[in-house]
Amino acid sequence: MTMTDPIADMLTRVRNASRAYHDRVVMPHSKIKTHIAEILQQEGYISGWHVEDATSAGGVGHTLVIDLKYGPNRERSIAGIKRISKPGLRVYAKATNLPKVLGGLGVAIISTSSGLLTDKQAGKRGVGGEVLAYIW
């Protein structure tokens, strides 16, 4: 069965695993999910990620494994994740009108012609694009 919105599926898996205090979350692999995981690691929301071959476990293809990050008293590093641009309603932002998440405390992931960037990186490069998600 095909998945309508794989990015929303990824964000939901990470949100649910974080709320349940799981140490890692496994999901089907794609290039855009890998780029989102890179951004989450650069911004300090996850401790790491890697791609595993699913054929050894009896599956097909590759899986993306994300290692979640918690504070010293098991406080979550991800307070919330929200999908913004959806297949039924795309949301775009110009370089001059990039969104700020929680007044700059959170991160917006934006798909630009230069690849996936955070709102701060897109602002420095002067590019706009599709607003994929907010993380705070």
From Swiss-Prot:
Q: Which PANTHER family match?
A: 40S RIBOSOMAL PROTEIN S15A
- Which example biological process does GO assign this protein? translation
Q: How does it assemble?
A: Part of the 30S ribosomal subunit. Contacts proteins S5 and S12.
User: According to the UniProt record, which cysteines are disulfide-bonded?
Assistant: none
Q: List, alphabetically, the InterPro entries matched.
A: Ribosomal_uS8, Ribosomal_uS8_sf
Annotated GO molecular function terms are: rRNA binding; structural constituent of ribosome
Which gene is annotated as encoding this protein in its UniProt record? rpsH
Q: Which Pfam families match?
A: Ribosomal_S8
Chain's role: One of the primary rRNA binding proteins, it binds directly to 16S rRNA central domain where it helps coordinate assembly of the platform of the 30S subunit.
Protein name, per record: Small ribosomal subunit protein uS8
Instruction: Name the protein family.
Output: Belongs to the universal ribosomal protein uS8 family.
Which keywords does this chain's UniProt record carry?
Answer: Ribonucleoprotein, Ribosomal protein, RNA-binding, rRNA-binding
Please name the source species: Frankia casuarinae (strain DSM 45818 / CECT 9043 / HFP020203 / CcI3)
One Gene Ontology term, aspect cellular component: ribosome
The source's domain of life comes to Bacteria
HAMAP family in the record: Ribosomal_uS8_B
